[in-house]
């Protein structure tokens, strides 16, 4: 922690994003993650966190909830799926994720429970993946801001090329949307469409442009990345 001038690091920042992978790596990484989030909040920077639970990484003596429950107390925007809420925050998710059909109302209840437990949170976005087959998923998301509950368009993603990076691309799209678009609904739709397109791209990164995402949002459901 002492190796950095934390105040100066956030002097010109407006948004700080972290994922649950970083504090899972080691005790020092967990300490740095918490300190960074606290400092960002103190400096008036918006903090977002993709909970992103990875069981195999938590092997240094602390469980994910022991670390993440404190970290999330310094977060404004949480991003998760139902497993992240359960495994990182200890909040039971009452839904059957392997059924191929998810109930939106269950996600409304889950989002409400998270915000009640963490009143510091301004919003939570939760992704919803209905696995029909290995290469055919229905993909959508919800967002709750403590007052209004939003649901995105549901995409039928067929012939999936690579699911890796789907969550990261959703987070990136949401951050873009919350900073650039007029409403939470628009931000959620942009995030879901960005992640939908990522399923057609091999590798970790969503190499798509804003224009390509907008094409999909405007009704171009071809699923093709424009090149």
Give the positions of each predicted feature:
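Conserved post-catalytic alpha-helical subdomain immediately downstream of the catalytic base
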Residues: 134, 150-220, 227
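Ribokinase/PfkB-type carbohydrate-kinase core domain
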Residues: 1-150, 154-157, 212-215, 221, ...
